[in-house]
């Protein structure tokens, strides 16, 4: 912990410089002494940056079922325990395990170049050796019969299963710099290419799903060398990386630029050769768990306030914003509350769910395993939208929950009242994030929205979602906001009614307790 303290001290010095330019405390904070202390502890002694270095840089990627995620679970328990907060890892099932090693992808003909790319999650490796092979582009077929007839031509090849983009410049760069006619032409070309490739995949009778899907399995059966794909995000240098269910043929994602290079060489019959050396280990079904931290309630210990953020992440980078940012916010909020409100009226839980990226698996399991928590839930605040300041809260279809939240917000410092827009009663959530398994049961669980910071381009699910993308001023502010809201929810004398707004309520989905393939 000595290194953590040294980093914390450097971060506190920087925070002190920033605070010199902030309005005085009396101008920021309400006269409620608890709110004042939350503000002081959260703003003056934040541990967000050293925690981020530990989670993102040292522990790193947290794919569900991986050793990295288990290490993060254990780190959370150890860290909470050091703060005097009870925490546990609660197992709910198993998921396919996988250990990511190094990825080396080279173009070796007609010229040499090391390519920017990485394995898809759960990809098999190359068995400790170089595998060199030619490439082939998945053609357009009339129907699945023609696809099956073509398969022998793919044997022993790396198969390209995505379009080569005509440009890797983001749309906003075209809008800012191209002539209107040129920008329109490029936009039309991109749209046509997307539609043509959608039809190309559908004609095979299979699907890529969220990676290689059932099509990948069929290509693997045909004896291919591997699958090459690309999912650029319309940002500079970023691409998304998801999953494969193949167990023999490796699957890799390349950057827009390097995929385009290989695609054009293949299209032009330049006979490119790729050499791959991929280290990976398929581990079979592995135990998976949520990490739950608890500050016990005093007077209403069977009523609950939940601070919610999923811990798992796609692992092309370190999952800093999706959803490491939410993890840090909830950890910091709990640390602040333990110091300021060690004996809240209601029990305050931090739920660090796993399996969110596989379909809200951990949070669904917890809601099934703990009906008493769902029944006694006063409020859940769920964070899953990156590093930005919380600037909106989505409704949950519960009028009484909306009324209480409006009251709580009205008692917060002016800076938060001006910053956070509440959407009112709204509609219940059908499954976008970890609040949904609670909200579908009629419990007050809401998603927090954040300032954008180009989240879709450079953060969620991409190869660039790393420590340096986190805005720690916003993390510090959000932790204070969440601690204040948890305090208000915990101490409110009234328990929130389950009366629902008119309309159709989404059905709850069961939690899979072991790997459930997504092939279509």
Residues covered by each model-derived region:
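Bacterial N-terminal signal peptides
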Residues: 10-22
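Noncatalytic luminal/extracellular "stalk/propeptide" segments of secretory-pathway proteins
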Residues: 29-34, 53, 57-194
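N-terminal capping segment at the start of a domain
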Residues: 30-66, 92, 102, 234-243, ...
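Soluble metallo-hydrolase cores and metallopeptidase-like ectodomains found primarily
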Residues: 32-34, 123-148, 236, 241-320, ...
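Second-shell loop/turn segments in exported
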Residues: 35-43, 57-67, 133-141, 147-149, ...
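Short helix-loop-beta-strand segments that form the rim/entrance of peptidase-like active sites
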Residues: 50, 82, 336-361, 380
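Active-site-adjacent substrate-binding region
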Residues: 196-209, 213-216, 220-221, 226, ...
């Amino acid at each position: 912990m000595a290194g953590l303290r040294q980093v914390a001290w450097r971060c506190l010095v920087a925070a002190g410089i920033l605070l010199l330019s902030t309005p005085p405390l009396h101008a920021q904070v309400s006269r409620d002494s608890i709110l004042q202390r939350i503000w002081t502890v959260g703003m003056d002694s934040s541990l967000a940056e050293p925690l981020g270095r530990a989670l993102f840089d040292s522990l790193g990627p947290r794919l569900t079922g991986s050793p990295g995620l288990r290490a993060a679970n254990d780190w959370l328990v150890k860290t909470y325990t050091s703060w005097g907060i009870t925490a546990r890892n609660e197992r709910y099932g198993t998921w396919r395990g996988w250990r990511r090693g190094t990825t080396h992808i080279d173009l070796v003909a007609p010229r040499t170049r090391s390519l920017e790319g990485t394995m898809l999650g759960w990809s098999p490796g190359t068995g400790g050796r170089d595998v060199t092979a030619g490439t082939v582009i998945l053609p357009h077929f009339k129907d699945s019969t023609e696809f099956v007839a073509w398969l022998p031509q793919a044997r022993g090849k790396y198969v390209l299963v995505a379009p080569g983009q005509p440009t890797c410049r983001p749309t906003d760069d075209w809008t800012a710099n191209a002539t209107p006619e040129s920008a329109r032409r490029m936009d039309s070309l991109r749209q046509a290419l997307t539609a043509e490739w959608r039809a190309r995949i559908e004609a095979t009778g299979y699907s890529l799903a969220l990676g290689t899907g059932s099509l990948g399995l069929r290509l693997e059966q045909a004896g291919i060398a591997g699958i090459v794909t690309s999912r650029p995000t319309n940002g500079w240098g970023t691409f998304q990386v998801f999953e494969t269910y193949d167990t023999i043929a490796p699957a890799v994602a390349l950057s827009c630029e390097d995929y385009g290079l290989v695609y054009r060489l293949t299209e032009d019959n330049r006979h490119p050769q790729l050499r791959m050396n991929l280290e990976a280990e398929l581990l079979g079904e592995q135990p998976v768990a949520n990490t739950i931290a608890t500050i016990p309630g005093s007077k209403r210990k069977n009523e609950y306030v939940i601070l919610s953020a999923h811990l798992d992440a796609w692992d092309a980078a370190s999952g800093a914003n999706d959803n490491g940012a939410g993890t840090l916010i909830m950890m910091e909020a709990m640390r602040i509350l333990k110091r300021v409100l060690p004996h809240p009226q209601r029990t305050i839980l931090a739920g660090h769910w796993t399996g969110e990226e596989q379909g809200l698996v951990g949070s669904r399991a917890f809601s099934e395993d703990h009906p008493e928590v769902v029944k006694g839930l006063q409020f859940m605040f769920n964070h899953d939208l990156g590093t930005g300041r919380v600037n909106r809260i989505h409704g949950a279809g519960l009028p009484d929950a909306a009324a209480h939240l409006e009251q709580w917000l009205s008692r917060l410092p002016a800076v938060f009242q001006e910053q956070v827009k509440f959407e009112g009663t709204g509609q219940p959530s059908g499954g976008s994030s970890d609040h949904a398994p609670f909200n579908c049961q009629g419990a007050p669980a809401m998603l927090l929205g954040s300032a954008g910071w180009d989240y879709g381009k450079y953060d969620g699910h991409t190869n660039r979602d790393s420590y340096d993308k986190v805005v720690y001023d916003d993390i510090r502010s959000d932790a204070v906001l969440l601690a204040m809201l948890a305090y208000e929810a915990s101490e409110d004398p009234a328990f929130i009614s389950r009366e629902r707004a008119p309309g159709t309520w989404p059905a709850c989905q069961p939690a899979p307790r072991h790997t459930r393939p997504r092939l279509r």
